[in-house]
């Protein structure tokens, strides 16, 4: 960039009244504005300081601290000015305008640099916002599906627990029912044993009655035989008496009528036979009734026993099935608890990783914010420098306007004058300190 193409519009408007001096630097020499210059000291007029922070020094300031060799003639011209100088007022005015042009070049480059930094800052902020949005999107994945899965597993666990509790209650009820049936079975068994004992007692009584009947029948036979013997003896006695009395002997005796033993015995026999028959019928009826009742009770008890046995078998099957289901539910519960534990461990590890990522991103955001604050501070410093430079330029413009009003135009600055008369190289009093706030020191051989 040449010094002639960097003059601002305001400075061009202020310099239209006076022609520009012809020098080597203003005729196309590549004189770069050095942003690292602290301030420029002139022997006739002390210029205010132009300070820039050392952070934004371009590479040209670090590699080269002097102007090119083609600019040494102009620097010699400016360096020859002092007390007792033979240059005219027009030459001094041209040197001052050249200095203002150089300052304008520096200001233009500085403004360009400021715009570039503003663009870079805007791009950096946009990138930071995009990165923060993307990181927020990547840092906050959708856990709703996992939460729904966890809720479903919890609901299944609760349902399984309720089912287990219901099965435990059913098992307890089945055990109580089995205990009741067992008690009923034992009561029926005791009743059956009592009935069998009664039947055995009745059978013994029946045997006794049968023996009594046999004894009575034997007695009846013996009585019949005795009656037959008595009849026979009576007939023999009657025959013997008839033989003794004769055929026609009639004896009239006043005595009680004779007793008919046969009739009496027949009556006794009939009575005893009737009694025995009645007793036999009564005993047979009672025995038959008892046997029928016992048979009915035995049949009922056997049916109930079969029903109880079938119920006990069914209950045992149900208990076995419930125990198998309970074991299966226990194993399912254990597997679900293991799965839940593994899921909790996995999610806790994922949450720890996410927390680490969040911590890292927060640290990065803190660093980015610190960088932004630092850049904002530097930007504020640049804005302050810009404002100070604008104030200095306004001051220089006012000084130039005052000088233009006081001094005549330089006749050597016509377009026909292409070069200036060289002068011997005298050391310049232009000093450029490296740091802000350091005093001026003369540069050797007129170099920056």
Swiss-Prot record:
Could you tell me which residues belong to the region Linker 1? 132-142
Give the miscellaneous note.
There are two types of hair/microfibrillar keratin, I (acidic) and II (neutral to basic).
InterPro entries in alphabetical order? Growth_fac_rcpt_cys_sf, IF_conserved, IF_rod_dom, Keratin_I
Region: Head, residue numbers: 1-96
What family does this chain come from, according to its entry? Belongs to the intermediate filament family.
Q: Give the tissue specificity.
A: Restricted to the hair cuticle.
- Please state what the protein is called: Keratin, type I cuticular Ha2
Residues in IF rod domain copies: 96-407
Q: Where is this region: Tail?
A: 404-448
Query: Region (Coil 2): which ranges?
Result: 260-403
Tell me yes or no: is Signal among this UniProt entry's keywords: no
The record's section on Gene3D superfamilies has: 1.20.5.170, Single helix bin (1.20.5.500), Vasodilator-stimulated phosphoprotein (1.20.5.1160)
Species per Swiss-Prot/TrEMBL record: Homo sapiens (Human)
Query: What Gene Ontology terms describe what this protein does at the molecular function level?
Result: structural molecule activity
Q: Where is this site: Stutter?
A: 345
Q: Where is this region: Linker 12?
A: 244-259
Q: Listed GO cellular component terms? A: cytoskeleton; cytosol; extracellular exosome; intermediate filament
The record's annotation in PANTHER family points to: INTERMEDIATE FILAMENT, KERATIN, TYPE I CUTICULAR HA2
Start and end residues of each stretch annotated as Coil 1B: 143-243
What SMART domains does its record include? Filament (SM01391)
Q: Which GO terms describe its biological process?
A: epidermis development; epithelial cell differentiation; intermediate filament organization
- Keyword terms: Coiled coil, Intermediate filament, Keratin
Q: Does the keyword Coiled coil apply?
A: yes
Q: Which superkingdom heads the taxonomic lineage of this protein's source?
A: Eukaryota
């Amino acid at each position: 960039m040449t010094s002639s193409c960097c003059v601002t519009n305001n400075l061009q408007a202020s310099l239209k009244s006076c022609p520009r001096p012809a020098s080597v630097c203003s005729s196309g020499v590549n004189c770069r504005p050095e942003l690292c210059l602290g301030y420029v000291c002139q022997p006739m007029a002390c210029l205010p300081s132009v300070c820039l922070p050392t952070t934004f020094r371009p590479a040209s300031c670090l590699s080269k601290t002097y102007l090119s060799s083609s600019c040494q003639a102009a620097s010699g011209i400016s360096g020859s000015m002092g007390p007792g100088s033979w240059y005219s007022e027009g030459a001094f005015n041209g040197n001052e305008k050249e200095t203002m042009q150089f300052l304008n070049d520096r200001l233009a480059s500085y403004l360009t640099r400021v715009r570039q930094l503003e663009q870079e800052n805007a791009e950096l902020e946009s990138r930071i916002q995009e990165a923060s949005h993307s990181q927020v999107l990547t840092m906050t994945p959708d856990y709703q599906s996992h939460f729904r899965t966890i809720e479903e597993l919890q609901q299944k666990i609760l349902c399984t627990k309720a089912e287990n509790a219901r099965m435990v209650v059913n098992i307890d009820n089945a055990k109580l029912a089995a205990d009741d049936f067992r008690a009923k079975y034992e009561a029926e068994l005791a009743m059956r044993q009592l009935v069998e004992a009664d039947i055995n007692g009745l059978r013994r009584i029946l045997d006794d009655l049968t023996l009594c009947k046999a004894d009575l029948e034997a007695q009846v036979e013996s009585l019949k035989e005795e009656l037959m013997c008595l009849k026979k003896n009576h007939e023999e006695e009657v025959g013997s008496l008839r033989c003794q009395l004769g055929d026609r002997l009639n004896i009239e005796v006043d005595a009680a009528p004779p007793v008919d033993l046969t009739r009496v015995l027949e009556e006794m026999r009939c009575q005893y036979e009737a009694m025995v028959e009645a007793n036999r019928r009564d005993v047979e009826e009672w025995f038959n009734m008892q046997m029928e009742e016992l048979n009915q009770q035995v049949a009922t008890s056997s049916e109930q026993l079969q029903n109880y046995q079938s119920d006990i078998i069914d209950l045992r099957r149900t208990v076995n099935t419930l125990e198998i289901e309970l074991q299966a539910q226990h194993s399912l519960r254990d597997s679900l608890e293991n799965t839940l534990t593994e899921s909790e461990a996995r999610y806790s590890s994922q949450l720890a990783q996410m927390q680490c990522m969040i911590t890292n991103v927060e640290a990065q955001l803190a660093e980015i914010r610190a960088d932004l604050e630092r850049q904002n501070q530097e930007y504020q410093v640049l804005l302050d420098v810009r404002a100070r430079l604008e104030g200095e330029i306004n001051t220089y413009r006012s000084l130039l306007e005052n000088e233009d009003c006081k001094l005549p135009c330089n006749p050597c600055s016509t377009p026909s004058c292409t070069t200036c008369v060289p002068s011997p190289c005298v050391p310049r009093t232009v000093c450029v300190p490296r740091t802000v706030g350091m005093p001026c020191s003369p540069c050797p051989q007129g170099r920056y």
